[in-house]
Regions:
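H/E-rich (His + Asp/Glu) clusters that bind or coordinate divalent metals
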Residues: 1-2, 171
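Catalytic pocket-lining loop regions of alpha/beta-barrel enzymes
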Residues: 119-172
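Mid-domain alpha/beta scaffold segments of enzyme catalytic cores
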Residues: 2-133, 144
Length: 172
């Protein structure tokens, strides 16, 4: 994507999901949708609220199968960007191809999983590639675990986004 902004930016929705309930869902998921969230409906939603652009985030129930969202990006490449979910062993070339399709970062959905060790070799390689591409890392984890994860991420120089406000307690 050589010209990321042919549409004037009036406002950006920084987190949305699009999907079809008929897609192949990942095993071990916490949620299974019983409805469709289409790109057309999302673009209409942006218009209704005076927003010109959006960032689509790979939903956890689709795992690392990013094909649906690549198709979604193709429907409005001048208005949409996307976060991919990837395996730690993904190649630099695969990430570069994703960048060409409008990917601007990776989402680490760590809810319900053991805390990763971001100093492990496979993570180091991934974060080096993310930094090289100028992408950001979106962390989806409970707020109590975020300081330790962020401390591990900072040396890589990647921009960090906290997903869902760090999932604070509902009483807040």
């Amino acid at each position: 994507m050589t010209d990321p902004c042919t549409t004037p930016i009036l406002g950006i929705d920084a987190h949305a999901h699009v999907f079809s309930k008929d897609l192949s869902l990942t095993s071990g998921r916490r949620y299974s949708p019983d409805y469709d969230a289409t790109v057309q409906a999302y673009l209409a939603h942006l218009h209704e609220h005076g927003l010109s652009h959006g960032v689509l985030v790979q939903p956890s129930f689709l795992g690392t199968d990013n094909r649906f969202l690549f198709d979604a990006l193709a429907q409005a490449p001048d208005r949409l960007r996307r976060l991919a979910v990837v395996d730690t062993d993904i190649s630099r070339g695969a990430l570069q191809r994703m960048a060409g399709l409008g990917i601007v970062g990776i989402r680490l959905n760590l809810i319900g999983r053991a805390l990763p060790d971001f100093t492990a070799p496979e993570w180091k390689s991934l974060f080096k590639n993310v930094w090289t591409l100028g992408w950001h890392v979106e962390l989806h984890r409970e707020v109590a675990d975020l300081p330790g994860l962020i401390r591990q991420l900072l040396p890589f120089g990647c921009k960090i986004v906290i997903d869902h406000f760090g999932r604070p307690a509902s009483r807040l």
